[in-house]
């Protein structure tokens, strides 16, 4: 364990941030999974609704710095392409 007061504080902050980041990443995975499920079921309306939710979650995560903005853009692009491919 850290000996300096500032190091102890930094450790507490890093633990808090790690927990927050983990929660956001879980939310991202669940949103993406929901879109993929709707795409495999070929339910276009539900897929588009879930895509909107996923885009929101990804944009928020990238603006908070949890994931890189290009990573978010890539995921959104691939999900959009999958939803547009539904006939």
UniProtKB/Swiss-Prot annotation:
One of its GO terms (cellular component) is cytosol. Belongs to the bacterial ribosomal protein bS20 family. Binds directly to 16S ribosomal RNA. This is Small ribosomal subunit protein bS20. It comes from the Bacteria. One of its GO terms (biological process) is translation. PANTHER family: 30S RIBOSOMAL PROTEIN S20, SMALL RIBOSOMAL SUBUNIT PROTEIN BS20C. GO terms for molecular function: small ribosomal subunit rRNA binding; structural constituent of ribosome. Keywords: Ribonucleoprotein, Ribosomal protein, RNA-binding, rRNA-binding. SUPFAM superfamilies: Ribosomal protein S20. Residues 1-23 are annotated as: Disordered. Pfam families: Ribosomal_S20p.
């Amino acid at each position: 364990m850290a000996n300096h007061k500032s190091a102890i504080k930094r450790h507490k902050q890093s633990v808090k941030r790690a927990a927050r980041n983990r929660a956001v990443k879980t939310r991202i995975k669940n949103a993406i999974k929901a879109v993929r499920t709707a795409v495999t079921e070929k339910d276009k309306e539900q897929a588009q609704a879930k895509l909107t939710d996923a885009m929101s979650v990804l944009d928020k995560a990238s603006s908070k710095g949890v994931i890189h903005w290009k990573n978010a853009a890539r995921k959104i692009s691939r999900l959009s392409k999958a939803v547009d491919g539904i006939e």
